[in-house]
């Protein structure tokens, strides 16, 4: 009786197509254009890493809006520093109010008692506090 599970697996794969297409575009950017212009993001994780994680966690619609807001904040007069993808989508967000998925100002920094930058000049590692 494996036929029903195969059917649901196929449906799940089709429903993941937009998410995978968005992540594929980010992968393409990270391996073509990003090396040419340099790795110089104002945030940790980088905007492409943030976008990939947001779309992986929340899908193309919600994750795409989160990524758009992050890209608009990543400019000389915007934010910088640690900006993590939220653990959960905002409770006030709805598919027909997509701007509510995103944080348009400030950063999603980890709580001070969870982690802090290692102080080694690179944000590649976080050390527990």
Curated annotation (Swiss-Prot):
Record's keyword annotation contains tRNA processing: no
InterPro entries assigned to the protein according to its UniProt record, in alphabetical order: Membr_insert_effic_factor_YidD
Keyword Cell inner membrane: yes
Any one annotated GO CC term: plasma membrane
Protein's membrane topology: Peripheral membrane protein
Transmembrane parts of this sequence: none
Domain of life, per lineage: Bacteria
Protein name in the entry: Putative membrane protein insertion efficiency factor
Organism per entry: Rhodopseudomonas palustris (strain ATCC BAA-98 / CGA009)
């Amino acid at each position: 009786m494996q036929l029903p599970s195969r059917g649901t697996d196929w449906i799940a794969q089709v429903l993941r197509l937009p998410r995978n297409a968005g992540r594929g575009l980010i992968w393409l950017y990270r391996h073509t254009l990003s090396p040419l212009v340099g790795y110089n993001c104002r945030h940790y994780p980088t905007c492409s890493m943030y976008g990939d994680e947001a779309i992986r966690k929340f899908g193309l619609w919600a994750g795409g809006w989160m990524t758009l807001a992050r890209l608009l904040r990543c400019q000389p007069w915007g934010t910088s520093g640690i900006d993590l993808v939220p653990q959960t989508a905002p409770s006030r967000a709805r598919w027909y109010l997509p701007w509510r998925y995103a944080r348009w100002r400030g950063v999603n920094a980890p709580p001070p008692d969870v982690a802090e930058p290692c102080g080694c000049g690179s944000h590649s590692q976080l050390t527990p506090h």
